[in-house]
UniProtKB/Swiss-Prot annotation:
GO terms for molecular function: enoyl-[acyl-carrier-protein] reductase (NADH) activity; NAD binding; trans-2-enoyl-CoA reductase (NADH) activity. Pfam families: Eno-Rase_FAD_bd (PF07055), Eno-Rase_NADH_b (PF12242), Enoyl_reductase (PF12241). Substrate binds at Y225. The keyword Lipid biosynthesis applies. Its EC number is 1.3.1.9. Belongs to the TER reductase family. This is Enoyl-[acyl-carrier-protein] reductase [NADH]. One of its GO terms (biological process) is fatty acid biosynthetic process. NCBIfam families: EnoyACPredFabV, PRK13656.1. Gene3D superfamilies: NAD(P)-binding Rossmann-like Domain.
């Protein structure tokens, strides 16, 4: 079939297999150009391995460090009538590239929150890897089923205390308008912590430890975004912020429970980037469009793969890791410089519908959004018929 983007609100409901493959290849090429990682991990488990920062982590570990990688994800396969999800095509492309490069790589498709998928991962590690020395936790999900009680929790994106009315870039209408987000109640906060906090990360590490598949001196990191004043009302001082704070609690718990292995656990603070998750968050499309304008003008903007390659080389495996005042590995320091934030604020205050293209890089934002789904990739002929069915090799049933 000929595949063109179908956009509904802030999501794209289809994906292009060839475009996704090219996008993955671009990231692989970037990592290779940076040279080999020093002190690289050997056996890596990536929980949330198919898109965004998780995919970039898998690519960096494999093609920057020669690591064996086991990827966990929850994606949809294509059929003859309907495309698969971008993450499915990304993983198919990653697996093909890993095979070509002679890199060990296996894949598990299913609910990472479940006990069943944890057990599958453990069985695979025992059979093929022995132990893992890096565990990346990069899940973004709107809901979670508690594996022990069966209760389903849904996350919300709401401020805490008072409702917030703020400027917003309505991406479907291409307009600047105002959005009011109602304040969260305690259930909203608790449920969001359940879905997006550190409990499942902790459960993964506990399960891996009990199964004796964690290497001595292993490292694990979960990813977070910690913005400044502009994004605080919806992101920091909000339900999602409380969930991210719970990652700090989990970090301490993981360090304590794995102290006999000298385990290292970190939360890594990363750039605001265009992902399927961030495009759903009110204010983020406008904030990122302004951020693009400022940081691209300075030549300092880093996308997903640039951030992760630098996180690995400078922080996770670097000689002098950089920490923020909260003790997180601090990779988005360029974004949070006062000068950058002041210029973003100036754009924010001034921009209206008529000046979107002049004052922000919304075009860049929109292009980056399309690229997530394999569209707008240079060198891909979108008039060509393509097969939406793309099998993933080395999938564990």
């Amino acid at each position: 079939m000929v595949i063109k983007p179908k956009i509904r609100g802030f999501i794209c409901t289809n994906a292009h297999p060839v475009g996704c493959s090219e996008h993955v290849q671009e990231q692989i090429n970037y990592v290779k150009q940076q040279g080999a990682l020093k002190n690289a991990p050997k056996n890596v488990l990536v929980i949330g391995a198919s898109t965004g920062y998780g995919l970039a982590s898998r690519i960096t570990a494999a093609f920057g460090g020669g690591a064996k990688t086991l990827g966990i994800f929850f994606e949809k396969e294509g059929t003859e009538r309907k495309t698969g999800s971008a993450g499915w095509y990304n993983t198919a492309a990653f697996q093909n590239a890993a095979d070509e490069a002679g890199l060990w790589s296996k894949n598990i498709n299913g609910d990472a929150f479940s006990n069943e998928i944890k057990q599958k991962a453990i069985d695979t590690i025992k059979a093929d890897l022995g132990k893992v020395d890096l565990i990346i936790y990069s899940l973004a999900s709107p809901r979670r089923t508690d594996p022990n009680t069966g209760e389903v929790f849904s996350s919300t994106l709401k401020p805490i205390g008072n409702a917030v009315t703020t400027k917003n870039l309505n991406t479907s209408k291409r307009e600047i308008d105002e959005i009011t987000v109602e304040a969260a109640n305690q259930d909203d906060i608790d449920n969001t912590i359940k879905v997006m906090g550190g409990e499942d990360w902790e459960m993964w590490i506990d399960a891996l430890k009990q199964a004796d598949v964690l290497a001595d001196n292993f490292k694990t990191t979960a990813y977070t975004y910690i913005g400044k004043e502009l994004t605080w009302p919806i992101y920091g001082h909000a339900t999602i912020g409380k969930a991210k704070e719970d990652l700090d609690r989990a970090t301490a718990a993981i360090k304590a429970s794995t102290s006999d292995l000298n385990g290292e656990a970190y939360v890594s603070s990363l750039n605001a980037v265009v992902t399927q998750a961030s495009s759903a968050i009110p204010i983020m499309p406008l904030y990122i469009s302004a951020l693009f304008k400022v940081m691209k003008a300075d030549g300092t903007y880093e996308g997903t793969i640039e951030q992760i390659q630098a996180l690995f080389s400078e922080n996770l495996y670097g000689d002098t890791p950089r920490f923020d005042e909260g003790g997180h590995l601090f990779q988005n320091y360029k974004e949070l410089e006062d000068d950058v934030q002041v210029r973003i604020q100036a754009i924010w205050d001034k921009v209206d519908t008529s000046s979107i293209d002049e004052l922000t890089d919304y075009v860049g934002y929109h292009n980056e959004f399309l690229r997530l789904f394999g569209f707008g990739i240079q060198g891909v002929d979108y008039e060509q018929e393509v097969d939406p069915v793309q099998p993933i090799a080395n999938m564990i049933d």
